[in-house]
Every structure is written in structure tokens, then in C-alpha cells.
Amino acid sequence: MTKFGVHSECGKLRTVMVCRPGLAHKRLTPDNCHDLLFDDVIWVERAQKDHAYMVEQMRARGIEVIEVHDALAKVLDDKAARNWILDRKVKADNVGIGMLSDLRSWLNEMPSSQLADHLVGGIAKFELPFDPKGLFGGYLDRSDFVLPPIPNSLFQRDPSCWIYEGVTLNPMYWPARRQETLILQSIYQFHPYFAGKVNIWWGGCDTDHGPATLEGGDVMPIGNGVVLIGMGERTSPQAVVQVAKRVLHREGGAKRVIACQMPKSRAAMHLDTVFSFLDIDLLSVFPDVVDEITCTSMYAGDREGEIRFERHEGVKLVDVVREALNLKEIRVIQTGGDAYQREREQWDDGNNVVALDRRVVVAYDRNTYTNRLMREHGVEVIEIPASELGRGRGGGHCMTCPIIRDEVKV
């Protein structure tokens, strides 16, 4: 039986989830891209080529890569699983009453691979093989979406995240992204690779979590039973404490959760946009933000469900991490260049690298200063083109959801 679990940020990566660019990105226009959380439209064919190159580099190192469209198509082959997804995706609240029956009948009979493409890529009114009835159907223009696309599925780090031997199914901050969690939940629940083998710590699409929001770019299981969770633009303290209660001192969970309070800005939307592990004792950081982070540690209390808090007033994140990992020293590589270049490279995901192993990372090619500094510190930097993939504001760390990763012995 496969043992899923992520035990560090930089140990050997063995299995990872990704989502290639596709139909959802062909739907992006200058008019709608900001609503869909992209800064610009992208050249989809080039983005697909660049994403495939990243996947090729991972597979060349023996990493098992699971692709969302393919996994979802496999799930949709099962009638019960298809019904489970469509019951939650195609509802009167989403598509109105008038077209509900006709739309559901059409999707029930659609080939699995085509349906997977549309569940991620959306459906426009002009694609319907029937004349949509009802007020909503008449309200829509020809190119309006019946089911909106979810192009941020490219960034698989966020809708679910593994914390040691369990996973959270994340209630995401922006409405444009909330359907991503449904896709991941269906894969973990019904795909034969995962079904019956996944320990879910918290979350799921059947509960309205209100302001308790969590995104995986803020979550880092760093080893020694410690997990960092950023609290900035996307992840709320209401969610962090609930997750802490579920993982602390549970079998396969964590012994310490460190909440990292960040400024709320799009440039630093997640912890992994300003802070990443290159090795257990080597970090890439954007100091302008990281030095302002305030940390609070959470531990299991004496009674069931009780949490003990320890606020680290005046102690920098890097020092909190060093102590939590029982390290004598942590070396820090700051985002490279002068003040202007440093800010540009952080914006272009210079710190958002994903480790394939200790001191082996995937990074965007455009961050030349930061990449050079990493190489000078003995890190192998595998560069991938940034011109198209980076338009959604996410790098290698954002585009990957580790499912099996080794621990690093301290």
C-alpha cells in the first residue's frame, strides 16, 4: 500500500501533482483575466511546452508526476464518482433552474476526457448543444460562461496540501478558485491510486468555512514535526487554528505549528512567494517581507483539543525556524540584485522555487541574479522559461503539489 506523506520542504521528492495549461487558459482575455486572477493573457501553446519541459525534468529524476486532467478523466470513468462531482458542480445555485436538467443530461453522457477538460476549462453558452431555458440562460450572452474556467488550477500547490501523513482540502480565499478544491477532493476520494488511502486532516467542499480560508502556498511541513503556515492575503487565522487542532500530536501529524503573520499584498500573497527551502539549512528569502513576519507557535495542550500558544515577539522567522529544526546555523540567500532588481525578481517568483532534492531546485530563468546566488551556494538550478507560465504569479513551488517527499535528517 502506497504511503503518502510530505515530511520536509527539501527532501527527495517522489510523487507530485501538477495541472498542465489547457482550455481554461484559452478562455483568458484582457477583459476577464483579472477576475480570473491572472495579470495578463498567455500564449497557451508556449505555456504548455514550458510546463511539459518542467514535468520532463522531474520525471528524468525518477519523480512520479500525476496530472490533474488525466487523473480527473480516470475518476469520471466511474459513474458514482461522476455523479458525485456533477451533483456539486451543476446545481441550480450555479446554472439556474431552467437549464439544469438539460445541462446535467449532456454532461452525464460526455466522454470522460472531454468532461475533465470542461470541468477545469469551463463551458461557454455557445458550446451548449441545446437552447438554454430559464432566466439565467436568457441573461447570458453567447460567449458568457455557464461554468466558469478555473485557470489557477495551474498552481496545484494551493487547493490541497500535505502536512506529514495527511492532507487538507482547502477552502480558498477568492471565489475564482474555490472549485479547484472540488476537483482535488474527487481525485483523492475516487481515483484508484488514492481511494481509501488518504488521511484528510481538515477541509472539503461540502462545508461552508466562511472566513476560515487556507491556501497551500502558505503551508510548509519543514521537518522535525514542525509546519509553517503563513497568514497574509489568502490564509486566515481562523483556518490556521483549526488545522493546528487537527494535526497537533495526532498520529502522522505535527508536534508544532508556527503561524507566520505577513503583510497582506498580492506581491506576497503566500509565504512561498518570499521564503523557500533550498536545503534544510539553506533558505531563499525576500528580506523586505520576511524580516517583518511575526511568528506564533502552537502546541497541543494538556487536554484534548486544547492548544498552547507562544508568541515570538521580536524574533525573526529565520531564527524561529533555526530553533524549531534544532540547527546551529541557517544560511540565507536574499533575493538578488539592487533594490529595484530585488523587487522585480521577487515579483517574478525568484523565491518561489521547488526543491526536487536537497540543493536541486526548479526556478524561472528570468531571475538571473537570484539564480546565480543559489548556484554560488552549491545549488543545482534547473531553469524553466517564465515568459508565459509566470503571468499568473506563480513559480515552480506554486505549480507543484508534493504528495510523497522524504524527510531530511537533522
Curated annotation (Swiss-Prot):
According to its UniProt entry, one GO biological process term is: arginine deiminase pathway
Q: Which residues form the active site?
A: C398 (amidino-cysteine intermediate)
Entry's localization field = Cytoplasm
Give GO terms: molecular function aspect only: arginine deiminase activity
Q: Which Pfam families match?
A: ADI
Recorded catalytic activity of this chain's protein? L-arginine + H2O = L-citrulline + NH4(+)
Q: Which stretches are annotated as coiled coil?
A: none
Recite the UniProt keywords alphabetically: Arginine metabolism, Cytoplasm, Hydrolase
Which biological pathway? Amino-acid degradation; L-arginine degradation via ADI pathway; carbamoyl phosphate from L-arginine: step 1/2
Q: What is its main location?
A: cytoplasm
Gene Ontology cellular component annotations, sorted alphabetically: cytoplasm
Which EC numbers characterise this protein's activity in its record?
Answer: 3.5.3.6
Give the highest taxon in the source lineage: Bacteria
UniProt keyword Cytoplasm present:
yes
InterPro entries recorded: Arg_deiminase (IPR003876)
Q: Which family does it belong to?
A: Belongs to the arginine deiminase family.
Task: Read off the NCBIfam families from this record.
Answer: PRK01388.1
* Name this protein carries in UniProt: Arginine deiminase
Organism whose genome encodes this protein: Chromobacterium violaceum (strain ATCC 12472 / DSM 30191 / JCM 1249 / CCUG 213 / NBRC 12614 / NCIMB 9131 / NCTC 9757 / MK)
What gene is behind this protein?
arcA
